[in-house]
């Protein structure tokens, strides 16, 4: 998968503006990952419930005040909804509803969100 990401970046002439990187959730962010990147693309990351807190921590470490994470999420199990509840407490989240293709992928229980660092510094309850 990593080599495919690198190939897509090259094919779309995005070097040096975009980079692919492997992240192990909950670990120190590797030096090759830009500090507080402008855009993070995340897809199909919600699949192993014990790792949910590690994913939240990693996103908190990555997101700066001007960062946005485009987070694609497929709802499969109740546990997946628990992740979304955790994320909504930790971040400012908004479902993207103005995508012309949303109807087709929503039918497959796939949803797209923006995730941003919480501006107020307070968690929603």
Language model segments and positions:
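S-adenosylmethionine-dependent methyltransferases
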Residues: 1-125
């Amino acid at each position: 998968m990593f080599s495919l990401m690198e190939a897509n970046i090259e094919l779309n002439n995005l070097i040096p503006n975009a980079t692919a990187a492997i992240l192990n959730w909950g670990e120190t962010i590797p030096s090759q990952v830009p500090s507080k990147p402008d855009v993070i693309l995340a897809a199909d990351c919600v699949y192993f419930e014990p790792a949910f807190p590690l994913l939240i921590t990693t996103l908190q470490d990555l997101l700066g005040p001007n960062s946005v994470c485009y987070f694609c999420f497929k709802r499969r199990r109740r546990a997946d909804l628990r992740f979304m509840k955790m994320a909504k407490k930790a971040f400012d989240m908004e479902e993207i509803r103005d995508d012309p293709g949303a109807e087709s992928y929503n039918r497959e229980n796939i949803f797209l969100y923006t995730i941003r660092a919480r501006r107020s510094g307070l968690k929603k309850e």
